[in-house]
Amino acid sequence: TEKFNGGYESWDSNRDKWCRSRNTFCKKYPRSQYNAAIHNIESIACYDYKAKIDSNVHRLHSVITNIQKDYRHFLLYDEQPLVGIDIANSQPYLLCLLFNPIFWEKDSNTTLNIGTLPTNIQSLFSQEHFVEIRDYVSSLTAEALQEYKQIASEGRVYDHIMSLINSRRNTTLDKKNVKTMMLIVFFSKNRYYHQQGATLKRLFDNTYPEIYSLIALAKRDNHAALACLLQSIESEIILHRCCKRIWKESNHQVPVFTIHDSIATTTEHVEWVKGIMQEELTNAIGIPPTLKEEQWNLSQVGHPQYLY
């Protein structure tokens, strides 16, 4: 591809990355990126997939999750192309589970509640905090949540909020701006609110005040708690429900590869895998998701003129 043909210097196109520990943008080093790409490609060639579930949010990491997106289009399974099945607007969609008061009760009889998640995730919240969140959610009306749940189910959260804010505020936000806004809303500290950079966070609060209040309440004692909770919910559903069921019902014959909120499989199995994902996500979250397919093949590669 263009980056490999151009050597180290061509890798500087992805030069800036947000560094949480330094609270600023840091340079990405082309040499490190180049070496990482080569390392991942060689690992796949050697069948060393480096699969490991982390002990923090219990996501599965592998050479496939680590490799840059463009290079996934070169991957085949048994000479067959792969298709990724993604949850549209996954984090905003998974948030809908937290609107259910019963989720916050460890001993409830729901298929997925805080008590079914790993103990380190449960320990992010005190029992008093569980009760406080549950009581707050119980106080919300169905009308306050209805619109958000509808657009989350349809995978239109970013588009809807972009349109809503632009019409109300006479602004020109694009989808990238809105995705940034959602990252800030979900993962930044609550005290980061009145600063100039938190404008989009305030816009979300003004648009969905009840939902913003729930997010802020969940992050009150630990701003990382919500991110860890949502990613753990994602892992529970994708790995331990969808993939486990696929593996069992197919008698170990259907290949699956996960990239956090996405499952990839071969073309012939896409519809069947999508059906299982649809059922498991709907059962767990309470509303159906929108699933999108991404073809992994050379026609999707950036700068295809460098392939041959």
Model-derived regions: residue spans:
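Surface-exposed, low-hydrophobicity interaction/linker segments
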Residues: 35-36, 43, 52, 199-244
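Helical catalytic core of nucleic-acid polymerases
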Residues: 64-223
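Active-site palm subdomain of RNA-directed nucleic acid polymerases
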Residues: 236-259
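Catalytic palm active-site di-aspartate
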Residues: 86-87, 182, 255-266
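Non-catalytic nucleic-acid-binding interfaces of large nucleic-acid enzymes and RNP effectors
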Residues: 1-73, 78-80, 88, 287-308
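A short acidic (Asp/Glu
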Residues: 91-98, 267-276
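Feature representing long, continuous alpha-helical segments
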Residues: 176, 180, 184, 236-240, ...
